[in-house]
Amino acid sequence: MDAKADLLSMTIEELENLMAEMGEQKFRAKQIFQWTNKGIKDIDAMTNLSKDLREKLKERAYINRLEVIKKFVSKIDGTIKYLFKLNDGNIIESVLMQYLHGYSACISSQVGCKMGCKFCASTGVGFVRNLTPGEMLDQILTIQNDTKNRIGNVVIMGIGEPLDNYENVVKFLRLVNHKDGINLGARHISVSTCGLVPEILRLAEEKIPVTLSISLHAPNDEIREKIMPINKRYSIDKIIEACKIYTETTNRRITFEYAMIDGLNDSKENALELAKRIRGMLCHVNLIPVNTVSDTGFKRSSREKITAFKEILERFGVETTVRRELGSDINAACGQLRRNLVENGQLVY
């Protein structure tokens, strides 16, 4: 017998095919889709389905269920960091952030990461597997059900490289954007990447106008290769060229994420070099005071250096912001909670 299907990972079209195989009417697919996207975890809770259909459905399918292992709530601004256990026992993280315009969730796309970025805690214990579309969607549903707050923005910027899990991430984008599901507009979704050029170009053709966030973190290849091994495959010039094609195709502004690391990439000369490379592009730069990860040796730039860097970029017409620091009293780099649990067998926070 084939393995059971996760209803949360299925499109309405896939559910329609399942209903046809089961000898059921097509409209049942939409009902099931609406139930799963409300966060229902029990097929028996689908009260507009007959008991007979529910029993048959349980033989063929299940609903993905995340378990909240731990959550940390900021006393300063209400930011919540979640540690989730997956069905197979693997661990991922998500974060809920509150802004003036509403709630934003930062979700994971993989268990671990292959990319090896030196300043990131996610890559420290290696790559395990990709997340399914349902596991990505369930992060949003579980947070919404836990907090009773509707999430208005999603950033796929947690553990993992989203474009390394391309097919599942794109399917997730279509699921979360569906009018009969969460119905989150594509313009309220950001997809982060360290710069997988072929996948950036593929994403441009998907006709899902999400915001693309590039983890750039350096003004030149020499510095970037020290902290991001992916740069040996895809240089900054190649990434920028792909970004220009993305903006031309989608008419969406690119965000360049830039972690400010003391003494490495934060000089006035670095700012000038970056400004000259990207001026005139439909883009904006988000400066990030780097998180401290115990074994990297990296320290965040001073406030004065960050301000000077920002002013130089703006002088060249590059729109620039400094990421607002949320949850500073529960501060941990993305992936740090999972890493502590995997390496030490306990939560060290």
UniProtKB/Swiss-Prot annotation:
Family to which the UniProt record says this protein belongs: Belongs to the radical SAM superfamily. RlmN family.
Ranges for domain Radical SAM core: 99-329
Active site: E93 (proton acceptor), C334 (s-methylcysteine intermediate)
Keywords: 4Fe-4S, Cytoplasm, Disulfide bond, Iron, Iron-sulfur, Metal-binding, Methyltransferase, rRNA processing, S-adenosyl-L-methionine, Transferase, tRNA processing
Additional record remark: Reaction proceeds by a ping-pong mechanism involving intermediate methylation of a conserved cysteine residue.
Listed name of the protein: Probable dual-specificity RNA methyltransferase RlmN
CC per GO annotation: cytoplasm
Compartment(s): Cytoplasm
Cofactors named for this entry: [4Fe-4S] cluster
Main location: cytoplasm
Catalytic activity of the protein: adenosine(2503) in 23S rRNA + 2 reduced [2Fe-2S]-[ferredoxin] + 2 S-adenosyl-L-methionine = 2-methyladenosine(2503) in 23S rRNA + 5'-deoxyadenosine + L-methionine + 2 oxidized [2Fe-2S]-[ferredoxin] + S-adenosyl-L-homocysteine; adenosine(37) in tRNA + 2 reduced [2Fe-2S]-[ferredoxin] + 2 S-adenosyl-L-methionine = 2-methyladenosine(37) in tRNA + 5'-deoxyadenosine + L-methionine + 2 oxidized [2Fe-2S]-[ferredoxin] + S-adenosyl-L-homocysteine
Cysteines paired by S-S bonds: C106-C334
GO BP term, example: tRNA methylation
GO molecular function, one term: tRNA (adenine(37)-C2)-methyltransferase activity
Keyword Disulfide bond: yes
EC primary class: transferase
Protein residues bound to S-adenosyl-L-methionine: G160, E161, S192, S215, L216, H217, N291
Record has Metal-binding as a keyword: yes
Enzyme nomenclature, EC number: 2.1.1.192
Function according to Swiss-Prot or TrEMBL: Specifically methylates position 2 of adenine 2503 in 23S rRNA and position 2 of adenine 37 in tRNAs.
